[in-house]
Regions:
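N-terminal hydrophobic targeting/anchoring segments and the immediately downstream early-domain regions
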Residues: 2-21, 138-152
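Generic structural signal of hydrophobic/aromatic residues within well-ordered alpha-helices
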Residues: 6, 24, 50, 191-194, ...
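Histidine/acidic residue-rich metal-binding segments in metalloenzymes
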Residues: 9-117, 121-137
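Glycine-rich, acidic/polar active-site loops that bind/position phosphate-bearing ligands
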Residues: 140-324
Length: 324
């Protein structure tokens, strides 16, 4: 079976990639509610308050939530979106989302598109099945997702994804974003005290993150022939190859044609989601590759890393690969 699968894998050709007619700078952040879209779709007073909250950490007034939600909904519907979700990072090494449609009863037997500030700011969901580190009983099921305005909303398919934190009903963090935001605030406070020794006009310290994503690409046929990969997503049996991390000739080598097509489509989709991908190359081990973006503000960079890992899985399937 394995020899036949390997033979079939060598016969596969690269999937053609449709490149947009525009330059990357023109379609960058096409599916992101960034400041350009905020300025176009929000009242000026609301835009200024939201930017002040993002840049300076000023608390948001609940009164601006309704115009923000209205502007966000208008843009999303124009982009063909039908649903929205509070998107967060539970303690499962992935992302979580629950999709709700932009529909409510209109009181006349019909439906109307609706998205209020209340729905934007906070939602209550079932948190009983998420890992919690033993901080609560399983019957205490309520969890709350709260909007993080410092990370812009984005569109995936027909869904508007709104980055949020996720906490239990007693206030404990049930995700990775809330502790990250707290640590960024702590670093900012400590760094400001040092900066004020040199310049009292310093008001904010920005934490930047330059991540890189290494990954392995495995042909779908070979992947399906390995029960350990199917069940766990990693190798648990078999012998190591004679050379793995010692393959210096593979590092920075010519990128295989099928892999190059995968990388091209991944970069196009990443740029549309506002992820500034810049570098791609072979890594050391067989079938190991790497992608790296331009560094960004820490919270945004972390969200982009989560988005791109999910994006890699989807794009890989279209090219006959599975990503490890």
């Amino acid at each position: 079976l394995r020899f036949r699968v390997v033979e079939e894998a060598f016969k596969k050709k690269a999937v053609p990639v449709e490149r947009p007619e525009e330059r990357p700078s023109e379609y960058f952040a096409k599916y992101v509610f960034n400041r350009e879209k905020m300025f176009r779709y929000l009242p000026r007073k609301t835009y200024d308050a939201l930017v002040d909250a993002i840049d300076n950490g000023k608390p948001l007034n609940r009164e601006i939530a309704d115009p923000v939600a209205a502007g966000m909904k208008k843009w999303a519907i124009e982009m063909g979106v039908t649903h929205y979700t509070h998107w967060f990072h539970p303690l499962t090494d992935g992302t979580a989302e629950k999709h709700d449609a932009f529909v409510e009863h209109d009181g006349k037997g019909g439906m109307v598109e609706e998205f209020s500030g209340k729905l934007l700011i906070q939602q209550e969901g079932d948190a009983s099945s998420f890992p919690n580190g033993g901080i609560r009983n399983t019957f205490e099921a309520r969890g709350y997702s709260a909007w993080d305005p410092s990370s812009p909303a984005f569109i995936v398919g027909d869904t508007l994804c709104i980055p949020t934190i996720f906490i239990s009903y007693t206030g404990e963090s049930l995700d990775y974003k809330a502790p990250l935001l707290k640590s960024i605030d702590a670093v900012t406070s400590a760094a400001l005290e040092v900066c004020h020794y040199f310049d009292s006009r310093v008001k904010k310290v920005y934490s930047y993150l330059g991540w890189e994503q290494e990954y392995f690409l495995v042909d779908e046929g070979l992947y399906a022939a390995r029960p350990d990969l199917l069940l766990t997503g990693r190798t648990l049996m078999g012998h190591e190859s004679s050379k793995n991390q010692q393959l210096e000739d593979h590092y920075f080598g010519a990128i295989p044609t099928r892999v190059s097509a995968f990388m091209q489509e991944l970069e196009i989709e990443s740029l549309k989601l506002g992820i500034p991908v810049k570098t791609r190359h072979n890594e050391v081990a067989p079938n190991q590759f790497e992608l790296a973006p331009i560094y960004e503000e820490c919270n945004l960079a972390n969200d982009h890393n989560q988005v791109i890992m999910e994006l890699m899985r989807r794009v890989a399937r279209r090219h006959g690969f599975r990503v490890l």
